[in-house]
Swiss-Prot record:
The lineage of its organism: Eukaryota, Viridiplantae, Streptophyta, Embryophyta, Tracheophyta. Its EC number is 7.2.2.12, 7.2.2.21. Gene3D superfamilies: 3.30.70.100, Calcium-transporting ATPase, cytoplasmic domain N, Calcium-transporting ATPase, cytoplasmic transduction domain A, HAD superfamily/HAD-like. Keywords: ATP-binding, Cadmium, Magnesium, Membrane, Metal-binding, Nucleotide-binding, Translocase, Transmembrane, Transmembrane helix, Zinc. InterPro entries: ATPase_P-typ_cyto_dom_N (IPR023299), ATPase_P-typ_P_site (IPR018303), ATPase_P-typ_TM_dom_sf (IPR023298), ATPase_P-typ_transduc_dom_A_sf (IPR008250), Cation_Transport_ATPase_IB (IPR051014), HAD-like_sf (IPR036412), HAD_sf (IPR023214), HMA_dom (IPR006121). The gene is HMA4. Involved in cadmium/zinc transport. This is Putative cadmium/zinc-transporting ATPase HMA4. It is found in: Membrane. The active site is at residue 401. It catalyses: Zn(2+)(in) + ATP + H2O = Zn(2+)(out) + ADP + phosphate + H(+); Cd(2+)(in) + ATP + H2O = Cd(2+)(out) + ADP + phosphate + H(+).
Amino acid sequence: MALQNKEEEKKKVKKLQKSYFDVLGICCTSEVPIIENILKSLDGVKEYSVIVPSRTVIVVHDSLLISPFQIAKALNEARLEANVRVNGETSFKNKWPSPFAVVSGLLLLLSFLKFVYSPLRWLAVAAVAAGIYPILAKAFASIKRPRIDINILVIITVIATLAMQDFMEAAAVVFLFTISDWLETRASYKATSVMQSLMSLAPQKAIIAETGEEVEVDEVKVDTVVAVKAGETIPIDGIVVDGNCEVDEKTLTGEAFPVPKQRDSTVWAGTINLNGYICVKTTSLAGDCVVAKMAKLVEEAQSSKTKSQRLIDKCSQYYTPAIILVSACVAIVPVIMKVHNLKHWFHLALVVLVSGCPCGLILSTPVATFCALTKAATSGLLIKSADYLDTLSKIKIVAFDKTGTITRGEFIVIDFKSLSRDINLRSLLYWVSSVESKSSHPMAATIVDYAKSVSVEPRPEEVEDYQNFPGEGIYGKIDGNDIFIGNKKIASRAGCSTVPEIEVDTKGGKTVGYVYVGERLAGFFNLSDACRSGVSQAMAELKSLGIKTAMLTGDNQAAAMHAQEQLGNVLDVVHGDLLPEDKSRIIQEFKKEGPTAMVGDGVNDAPALATADIGISMGISGSALATQTGNIILMSNDIRRIPQAVKLARRARRKVVENVCLSIILKAGILALAFAGHPLIWAAVLVDVGTCLLVIFNSMLLLREKKKIGNKKCYRASTSKLNGRKLEGDDDYVVDLEAGLLTKSGNGQCKSSCCGDKKNQENVVMMKPSSKTSSDHSHPGCCGDKKEEKVKPLVKDGCCSEKTRKSEGDMVSLSSCKKSSHVKHDLKMKGGSGCCASKNEKGKEVVAKSCCEKPKQQVESVGDCKSGHCEKKKQAEDIVVPVQIIGHALTHVEIELQTKETCKTSCCDSKEKVKETGLLLSSENTPYLEKGVLIKDEGNCKSGSENMGTVKQSCHEKGCSDEKQTGEITLASEEETDDQDCSSGCCVNEGTVKQSFDEKKHSVLVEKEGLDMETGFCCDAKLVCCGNTEGEVKEQCRLEIKKEEHCKSGCCGEEIQTGEITLVSEEETESTNCSTGCCVDKEEVTQTCHEKPASLVVSGLEVKKDEHCESSHRAVKVETCCKVKIPEACASKCRDRAKRHSGKSCCRSYAKELCSHRHHHHHHHHHHHVSA
């Protein structure tokens, strides 16, 4: 019986159809009651809504009782010009005015020749006759449904004007009125085309992966696997089960950059597969996918009205009858009083009558609201009602949840301990992870992943009686044990009256979770989380808008305060240890100060979201309940969209005020002109028409992008795999330029090697970190204009091989680091999501003077340079740059010079020369050394080099004694490349590491720790090719190019043969060219300077010419052993076109296998030679 009812319900739903109609006859809200009355009278119509600005009617009807064409026919009987809109259609049908308007206009124009030949004045009457039909038809339809509208008023005006023999005026009225209808339709189409394209994002067809059959998306069931080729739009929400690609989600979330997708990634209908072939297992029906829900929300929002709109609509009902009454009085009273010049009074009455249409006033609010809602939707913000847009413009306080809103919600398990002797750690972890598998909290997923990483497999099916206690924790029964997991408050649920005192680490914002087995505290765990990028920027923007910010979290106060510190103490109020009801209570208190918004993403936030004046829920990733409760939905996780939404709401409110004022002033102006003795009927019609158009065009300004103020930035071509690092949620104009800084050529354009396409650049500024000891100086010659205030993260996005990506912190694949014998313990410590991080990360700020040019002279830290050092006694400027020292500090030497910013020409005699003074504190007797750096003509930053901002230096420096030699190892600070490609992108230390060679003491001052912060593959591959002694890395590899097809390594030694690993970062592997993703410098061969045969080799000393080494020293060219040529090694394995998309992994695994084999073969050579 139940099954039968379900089947009947399904049939009933299938019979119901949603149809869209373009109704061109809608002028303003005065037509809405006419449409409603028509639709009410039709059998089979269940629901309907009218969107006035877009002239759209949406009808849900029984397809068996009434068809869309029958509904359109009923609307057209009232002369509403309705058409059924075909799915996905956004083209404008009426590209040209109606024939009535064209003929009427031509005849009116010819009638002006009456001054030459008077009988031609009758052409004006013909113009009236030619254009009056549409107006008459609409007026007749209005009379049938007794209602006075503008069409009836125009007919009365035309008849009266003709009666007074003002033929040209009557013709002008008819022509202006008929042409205005077309102009308004065209203007409103431009405003609505964006929204119509948004509504039809998802395709109507899908291809079944197994059979290749093309079917309607409505027929696709849940768990069906559909195929999506490159360039196609994803038809339905689902999970990728095969293949990988990049997806453009801009239309859905506002995300400007392509989002990489691989197996188990979620994809949404309406987003575009840019490259690659993927198979998607559907997770919802076509009508339930995110884009369909989004379209429904937008439709509901557009058909809703603000309070001001409802007030204007109510007033307009009385406005028109009142104007008709006034007009009648103006015409009749002078006749009764037998006033002279009755024609003037009749003209005046007609001007008043034509002013009786309040269309401009009525449209002033809905058009502005419509445009604002459209702009918000295309930016990844869904505002559920026009009223919420109005409220958002008045917001005074915004409160944020912490986990998943301010922070990423991507936790790392720092510690997991069992406190009970009879319960081992694995058993406890098994119970906890099994219960957590049933929770949707971000912490739960982290604990489940942690359990799997230590080979503990959770079994959620074994958990009984699962319960969730919002703000406290969760409960589940497994293996006969009652397991309670949560914060301190969960103790009371477990029946533990006194919480045992245990020492837990809450420093650094760690979140502590407690595990109770029955009434006994059995264990605890520590989790840490990081703030989202862009949050502090969003808070600063909200402050600049005069909005107070607050954080409300159920997490402990220490974690809350740590997040506040991470954000630079930008929040005004911070509350920790809150239950859901506590959040609601605090929101109530905030509301006393002014309208309050709450931003959250979880079940715990639902009560607070409902209590606030505006609830903003965090997007597609947010829980379903939060999305339902929120008044505004943030489709992405970028909090910077919130100040943007507030600005948009305030702009929309201003536009409404402007529109209302414009409408009233113009109407009042024409009436004042008429009463002042100039009653122009055609002018009154023109004002009526013009007001509507002005209101529409003024509102459409909301759809325009506001120009960003500031210098244009130089990017690589969008097709490059080496785009600048982009933080999560960054817009396309906010890009980390640290790795993307390139030179500018003399013609004011960035070089093509930097930008891909030449972008014009007037003011080119070098990015410079700020510090306490230095002010920001602009350095000419480098592209990029973003001045950073904080030391940048050490590693780029995408460095981890795991799914979860972080944009800051040290990142190395944990598995690769653990496997490598060369990486010391402190680099093997646990990082987040399988990433290594270094405990000894330090940032040093050092000062270098760039003013003086004479060797062996110390630069004074303050004041002018000594005479003769510079032209015109130019002021010495500090260059302060952070030196990142990873692992252990350098032995015995504090390096005080770093050539990150050598693009400085303002203080030297020659533009081709840069002087810097290095301070090496190896001993008291060491003199100050001055380094002369020559820069090539093409600009201060070398073109064609992926190693931005670094300049080669010779082995012997000016002012050095013969025994003292300095040099540098230059590592590429390049952006991330795709996934784990071996490339210059693997090198991540930001800047240059110096080494010093002291002959007298017969010792080499080198690093103790290799600076290997690469993706999993590169970490192993590069170390494979370098020698090792006693477990310490003595050399640092540097990939360089000798020819197009070779990548050279900078390891040294005659007997040591070092590796060359050439990988492609693009799908096409048959080309013989070495890709830019792999190589560092196309015109350079690194050589190694050996000081003495018996001494240890200092690797990485760069020698430009052989004469830099004395006769007893030899410059040895680096040869290659671990060579993987592209065509033979990779292309042969990837030649199958069906598997072409997996080419990169093929090449990578092959190279790794080959290189590892060679490494084992030559390992004893490495050891022997370096120990010599």
